[in-house]
Amino acid sequence: MNSMKQKEAFLGVDYGKKRIGLAFASAPLLITLPIGSINTCSSLALTAQALITIIKERAVTTVVFGNPLPMQKSYASSVQSEIQELAALVRDMTSLEVILWDERLSSAQAERMLKNDCGLSRKQRKNSSDSLAATLILSSFLDSRKLY
């Protein structure tokens, strides 16, 4: 198990054009929890400011953005470009560690879990899927680092 600082705290981000799902984990337990979603703002700079407010409230030390890599190595989507730009803004405005993490199919997996395992309606799933996707992204990142 890697040693870690007692004050490490992670924010998982599942970016979408309308909503951004959020998840949080902090040392020493690093249990990843969905913490809801925020609406995407009219500009990436405003969206970065909204995220920074949450980062400060929770004393986050590392931000993990889901990065929707294409299934086939072709071209980057406009969403992927926006995520990269938003991640750079957050990094520049906070000087925190910002990581782009492969999130292929995390939103689809979250939707499937909510539909099949939880039996939620489409409206209920819409309200929960973004933060669950962020939870899956952050959990995957933490698992890869063997921080649990």
Swiss-Prot record:
Its EC number is 3.1.-.-. Gene3D superfamilies: YqgF/RNase H-like domain. GO terms for cellular component: cytosol. GO terms for biological process: rRNA 5'-end processing. SMART domains: YqgFc. Its main location: cytoplasm. It is found in: Cytoplasm. The keyword Acetylation does not apply. Could be a nuclease involved in processing of the 5'-end of pre-16S rRNA. Belongs to the YqgF nuclease family. This is Putative pre-16S rRNA nuclease. It comes from Chlamydia muridarum (strain MoPn / Nigg).
